[in-house]
């Protein structure tokens, strides 16, 4: 990991895939890698824990993330480069703003190149900003994220505010008092977002009936794979359980996760094996036992696939992990 200067309420770092569990403020996540190639992702975070945050990540790896968002805050994610990623089942597009309400269980498929700015504030503060900017408060279901795509002119105006605002907050981060509560620049930025959202199309762009169906199919299949990870899961069985053809399943997985069903199952098994291997020294588990626990029967192939995805052998993961 290469670090740039970090301060108590500010960090600007480059992280590998294993370190991305805290890349989103207010949202600790479980990360599963989806492909072997990666470069360090740049993560900039300015925050006053529990009060507000501004995240500016640029990801350079493919992964699946799942986590529960803060029960008292709302996140407004302004997408700069989408690169085929999805958040909460919403296919992202450039210049889209995704609103994630408090307490949402967030699922995301991140593709290399995704870049966004996420502002996190208490729900009550966002309601006040909406009321002042638009004269109305938008009711949001606790578990229902939404998205609008901004007009080009509004999107450019929003983008122009982000970097200067982040630089200003970084400079002020040596004085915790200045950043304890949402700064005026952040409030003005959120006001501009509220205005832009109010005049944008309020339907959820990209969520056509067919796209929504494919997302539901892929997520149902993902749940089934998790529940039966110790078992053999041929694609025929998966299709039968979900009630779709092999072609439909293939399309649903590539549209949602960017990989085939077989590649997804293999990656999920390898990621689960990695989690178990990091505690294997304390629990006394062997590489063979861990592989069997996640439904892997070909140990030679397992070692090669594991090294390809994580850059080290299963035994190296065990030895590198700290004993409890």
Language model regions located:
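Alpha-helical bundle regulatory/interaction domains
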Residues: 2-34, 38, 84-229, 234-236, ...
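Conserved short histidine dyad/triad with adjacent acidic residue
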Residues: 36-40, 44, 48-69
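Short acidic (Asp/Glu) patches
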Residues: 58-63, 79-83, 100-104
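Short hydrophobic/aromatic patch on the recognition helix
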Residues: 249, 253, 301-302, 306
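A short, basic/aromatic helix-end/turn motif that makes direct DNA contacts
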Residues: 254, 293-297, 307
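Alpha-helical DNA-recognition elements
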Residues: 255-256, 308-309, 320
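An amphipathic alpha-helix adjacent to DNA-recognition modules
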Residues: 263-266, 270
